[in-house]
């Protein structure tokens, strides 16, 4: 295939996706993807796992005529990389999550804003940033949302930069240039009174009020403002006294959607209080079933406890054993012993 791509590139210009299957197992991926990026096509429940031939499920699902056309239009994007143009297609979990989130967004915005769209919990390494990109594209192009503004909020500069890089590389798919906020003044100039459109990136700390114990100034009361928060499980997204309260002051009629790669307990009232209930769950178990994540094993080791007196005896024996050695050899051995010693637990005598 690589030889054909190199020698007859025109042969693949109209290719939408590649399928590899032996009937029982099937994988789908783009022409520029490595094999590790090929995935099965499933429902989010995984009910069909081990009960149906994967090829049959893929043909009846992804290759259903209406879904296939929609997938090509809305879930395929191109990014310019150093090695050339890369074609990216959505995994089934990204497709289902973005579709469900769009529907929930339309419902919440139609209720005059202040909506809790929900939470997308997709495990680490599952392509969360691309899921956000696909969803932003769907939201931006949806006519019923009247050219909305999407604000992507993170709590760290490095995370903000990573997400912005992904979105910026996908600007042709988004049909607009994303904007990264540099400081508080830039935030106000970009968002104050903004009438429509835009994909804006900012760290949440920029929404702090200018003076302590005061409110963040109103930037827009539009109802079609969508705030996407990454790592939404973190405590700063508290609507009462966290940063989410300042976001709410700035955009009182906005709708919130949270993304997280960390499990959220049902007792986590704050996260669901700000963002709403779960929209999509792609946990570690599902990722392992898709061979996207390697199994994680925990081998419990019970360490033998050593008393302080015993440790002192060992120290003395060590000094005696190394007495005739060169200083360099002794120091090297001491460093090794100190590392081992730090792993031992001591009990009181």
For the regions a language model picked out, list residue spans one by one.
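Structural recognition of the conserved hydrophobic beta-strand(s) that form the central parallel beta-sheet
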Residues: 20, 200-202, 255-260
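Conserved RecA-like ASCE ATPase "motif II neighborhood" in helicase/translocase motors
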Residues: 199-228, 236-243
């Amino acid at each position: 295939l690589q030889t054909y791509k190199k020698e007859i590139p025109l042969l693949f210009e109209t290719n939408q996706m590649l399928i590899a299957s032996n009937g029982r197992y099937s994988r789908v991926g783009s022409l520029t993807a490595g094999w590790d990026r090929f995935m099965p096509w499933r429902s989010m429940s995984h009910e069909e796992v081990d009960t149906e031939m994967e090829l049959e499920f893929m043909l009846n699902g992804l290759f259903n005529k209406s879904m296939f056309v929609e997938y090509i239009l809305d879930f395929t994007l191109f990014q310019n990389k150093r090695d050339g143009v890369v074609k990216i297609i959505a995994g089934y979990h990204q497709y289902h999550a973005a579709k469900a989130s769009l529907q929930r967004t339309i419902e919440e915005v139609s209720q005059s804003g202040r909506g809790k769209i929900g939470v997308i919990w997709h495990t680490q390494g599952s392509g969360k940033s691309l899921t956000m990109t696909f969803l932003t594209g769907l939201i931006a192009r949806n006519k019923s949302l009247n050219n909305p503004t999407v604000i992507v909020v993170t709590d760290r500069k490095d995370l903000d930069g990573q997400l912005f890089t992904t979105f910026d590389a996908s600007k042709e798919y988004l049909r607009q240039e994303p904007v990264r906020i540099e400081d508080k003044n830039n935030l106000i100039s970009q968002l104050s009174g903004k009438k429509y459109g835009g994909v804006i990136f900012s760290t949440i700390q920029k929404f702090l009020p200018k003076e302590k114990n005061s409110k963040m100034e109103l930037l827009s009361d539009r109802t079609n403002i969508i705030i996407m928060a990454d790592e939404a499980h973190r405590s700063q997204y508290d609507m009462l006294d966290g940063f989410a309260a300042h976001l709410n002051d700035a955009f009182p009629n906005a709708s919130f959607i949270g993304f997280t790669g960390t499990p959220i307990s049902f007792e986590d009232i704050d996260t669901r209080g700000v963002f709403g209930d779960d929209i999509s769950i792609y946990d570690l178990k599902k990722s392992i079933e898709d061979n996207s994540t390697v199994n994680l094993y925990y081998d419990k080791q019970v360490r033998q406890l050593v008393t302080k007196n015993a440790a002192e005896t060992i120290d003395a024996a060590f000094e005696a054993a190394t007495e005739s050695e060169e200083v360099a050899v002794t120091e090297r051995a001491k460093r090794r012993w100190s590392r081992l010693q730090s792993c031992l637990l001591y009990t009181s005598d």
